[in-house]
């Protein structure tokens, strides 16, 4: 029966199945020389499709291209047009789509397919429909390729979708817009808290803002110290492909991909069956640091470990171990830390050695003031984490609704 599991009470009757060939007119986008990019009319590329899940607005479009008025007319994108990603390295991502919600004229790039409406629909409803599992499954199954996966106009024409009347589409669209607004508000709150934290860190570590002792007295002067004087840098585990397990057994080896936005993320796992020295078993309050990577921007990113699982860390990582780590973990998020990282990167390889890390020099307050600073910043982090969880819950709630409000 072609009706959704969740439905507004004012509506009944079956949704009608419609082929994309009857819903859209498809066209591939602009192919221009590299000299033509960077000026002219705005054009939608693959990144615009991926980075704007709630719809592409005029202001969100990054690129521009200098083409003739004739080319503009042929490749114009209008309000409500759907844009599809033509190719991807993975089948799961091919054919990702988005709707243009801007009123100003734009064009679209050669790695994109435009679907111009042949029948009237609500663009926000259509954007939600295209992100449901059933539509995504149809599109990915129709893609082809081996090293790269592609979807063409003919394949997209074979996709079918169930649509209600326009009035019900608009009702669903309004509901989805309200959910998106809630997520947007939470995201803005998260950004403001993060900015507040950065501002307070700037003031605290520059000593522009100082705490006082519990008795109201002033703390003493901060002292220059090297990281090697107050703690120890430890080199990670070297292992071979034959040590890696594929059945979930063995010890987890932490790598750079396990540090995401200052948090430990264990979703990307490599586990090994190998005898591990006690020294390179991660301890509570250890700081995990990326010390070697093909991407220079990842060097120096770190996270403090507060996890009960027995874990080790890879050879491209380092662990810093100190009784002052609650303070030092925040110190390693400051511009002063990353300035020293950039100054000491290897000439040929993107790396900082443990010996180099030991020479990094910073101003340190007494332990009592360190504790007050760490407690203050930790309280902000807890608020940021609560909002991050609320954002994720709201996204999952919306995703669940998408699967039930569409056929």
Predicted region positions:
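Extended amphipathic alpha-helical segments enriched in small hydrophobics
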Residues: 169-172, 179, 366-394
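Sequence-specific dsDNA recognition surfaces
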Residues: 21-33, 48-82, 228-242, 257-286, ...
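Non-catalytic DNA-recognition/assembly elements of restriction-modification systems
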Residues: 3-30, 158, 166, 213-237, ...
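Short amphipathic coiled-coil heptad-repeat segments
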Residues: 1-12, 178, 183-223, 386-407
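A short beta-sheet element
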Residues: 45-46, 62-131, 255-256, 275-335, ...
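A short glycine-rich beta-alpha junction/loop motif
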Residues: 2-4, 31, 105-111, 143-167, ...
